[in-house]
C-alpha cells in the first residue's frame, strides 16, 4: 500500500562500510589482558572481589564479565558481581539485578553471585564539596573491578566521558549518589564531577582497576584493556579519543526527517544517542561534526528498555503504541535523577506511522513536502544500513564508504497504517 496523502521522496537502501575491528575470541582477549596486568597479579588469594557491570547494551558483556570472574577464580579469589547503576532498573535492587539478568549475567551463568543493593556509604568529599557515596557491597569487598565500555557521552564533551571513571563515580554512587552528582553537574559540569568523585573513590584504595571495552562502528568488541588505577585517567583519555575516531553517523549532512524504528536504554543511556540524532537538553543540532536534523519520528520503544522511555522527549512525534509501553515511574525517575526533565516528556503522538508522517512532514520547513529529505534507521546505535531519500543520493554516490544496495521504493504501510519494516528487529547486545 503506497503513501497516498502526499507525494514524498522514494527511499533507497544503503550500506555504510565501516572498518571491522572485531576480536576473534573475546574471552581469550580478556584473559590475556588480565594475566598481563601487573596490578591483577598482586591481589592475594582469598580476596573478595566485587566485579561491576552496568546497564548499557554492551556487546558480549556476559562473555566479558564471565571471563573476568573466571580470572579471579583462577587466582583463588572470591569474585561476586554488583550492578553498577544509578537510577536504572527503576532505582531498585531487584530491578537492577533484573537488568543484568536480561543481559545474561546471573549466578547460574556467571558462576558467581550477583549481589544487588542500593545501600551506600559516604567515603569522603571532593575539593568542590561533593559528598561521595559508594556502593556498600563494593566498599566492604577487598577490591573492586569495573567492566565498562569507553565511548562518548550523550550530554557533554570532554577528555573523560562514558567509561570506567563515569561508572566509578555515578554507578558506584547508586541512586543516592547519582541524584547528587547530576545536581552538581549543573554547576561545575559532568566531567568535573566525574574527575572529582572518581578521585575520592580512588583514594579509598578499594579500586583495583577496570576493564575498558571498545566497540567498533558495527558494535563488535574491538579491544579490551585492563587499566590499573595508577594510569587509569591517562589511558582512558587515550581510549576515548580512539573510539571517537571510529564513530558512525547518519549518512547525510542535513536531514529534514529522521525516522527511528526504536528508542531505548539498550541503545543509549539517553534512549537515543544524542550525538547521532543531534539533540541535547539545550535544543536541536548542538553537536558539531554531526548531521543537522530538523525533525525526529520514533516509531516504537525497545522491549529491552523495559518501559523506560527516557529520551523520547528528543523526538518531535511518536506513536500511540510507543506511549502505551511507557513505564512513567522508571522514565521519570531516570529524568529526575539526571536533573533533566525534557528528555522524559512525551511528544505529540498519533495512532499509526502514516498519520505521524502526514502530520510532521509539513513542519520540516519545505513548502513542497516532496522535497523533504528523509533517513530511516533502526535505532541510533545500528547505522550500518539505512533507507535514504533519493534526493540525498547525489552526495552519497562518490563516498567510498557508502554502498547503494537497493532500488528506489515508496514507503509502504500495512492495513493498520504502520510502515512495513525495512530492518530486522534489533537483537539484544550481549
Placement of each model-derived feature along the sequence:
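A conserved active-site cap/scaffold subdomain adjacent to cofactor or substrate pockets
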Residues: 220-276
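C-terminal non-catalytic interaction/assembly regions of soluble proteins
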Residues: 274-430
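Glycine-rich phosphate/diphosphate-binding loops that line cofactor/substrate pockets in enzymes
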Residues: 34-50, 73-74, 251-252
